[in-house]
Amino acid sequence: MVSQTVSVAVTGGTGQIAYSFLFSLAHGDVFGLDCGIDLRIYDIPGTERALSGVRMELDDGAFPLLQRVQVTTSLHDAFDGIDAAFLIGSVPRGPGMERRDLLKKNGEIFATQGKALNTTAKRDAKIFVVGNPVNTNCWIAMNHAPRLLRKNFHAMLRLDQNRMHSMLSHRAEVPLSAVSQVVVWGNHSAKQVPDFTQALINDRPIAETIADRDWLENIMVPSVQSRGSAVIEARGKSSAASAARALAEAARSIYQPKEGEWFSSGVCSDHNPYGLPEDLIFGFPCRMLATGEYEVIPRLPWDAFIRGKMQISLDEILQEKASVSL
């Protein structure tokens, strides 16, 4: 039985990530099995036929939670009165394209989306950004939507967290459920910071199970950092199904939190407990409070290895921010 209904927008609705995510969303994986969904699926003009096909499949899925499905090429219609938005659509990096070119193209897209959110979305709407470069895209959208709460903008680092979680599980030869406090800091890029020093295995410090520090620093960390490129090289396309699952999990950690769960998210750095510059979207370990708000987990120690990686990631975020104009 549906106890409430949320209005949700998904952009990039004809893309691979959205295609996987929409069915997970419709099944109740994000908001729960008692929450109805008023769904708006957006993509750019020219995609109308493909959007209609996505709607057909959702209709054919006969999902009880879907109260309404609207497909549109209007951001105003997509974002009108929404409770949550999943900003998936972006320009992918093409052959010969420099990162600065990608930042410029996507900066324009997310500035436009931020302005539309500012005009039409609910003030307390939660915004989950997936399109890369995700930290900077999220920052651009946030700063173009000053009416919305800055704390409710999230850049997805959950896929990085999941990759690290899986690698630690395999190395320790334990179930995924035995591994906890997996943390990824900083930028979602090859300079992200997979922080194994906080992780627990069977509620014990990781070093008691994985004593090989060289493997952690020189195999695991760079493997997580470069996993996206490895997937592209292997399948010829970027991560889609795993990214969609990570997005569903990232949102579920906020809407249906587990007691004591840590999750990594790129959030606004204003008033952060680590003294990092404000007005950034930076990956932090977070947890939900009884109030329904999240907090950045404070007072986690950084050893020399992690501190060095943190500075590299911070410098990259600052460089990206400096390269775009609001």
From Swiss-Prot:
Belongs to the LDH/MDH superfamily. MDH type 2 family. It comes from Chlamydia trachomatis serovar D (strain ATCC VR-885 / DSM 19411 / UW-3/Cx). GO terms for molecular function: L-malate dehydrogenase (NAD+) activity. This is Malate dehydrogenase. The keyword Cell wall biogenesis/degradation does not apply. It is an enzyme of class 1 (oxidoreductase). It catalyses: (S)-malate + NAD(+) = oxaloacetate + NADH + H(+). NAD(+) binds at G12, G13, T14, G15, Q16, I17, A18, N106, Q113, V130, G131, N132. HAMAP family: Malate_dehydrog_2. The gene is mdh. One of its GO terms (biological process) is tricarboxylic acid cycle. Substrate binds at R93, R99, N132, R163. The keyword Oxidoreductase applies.
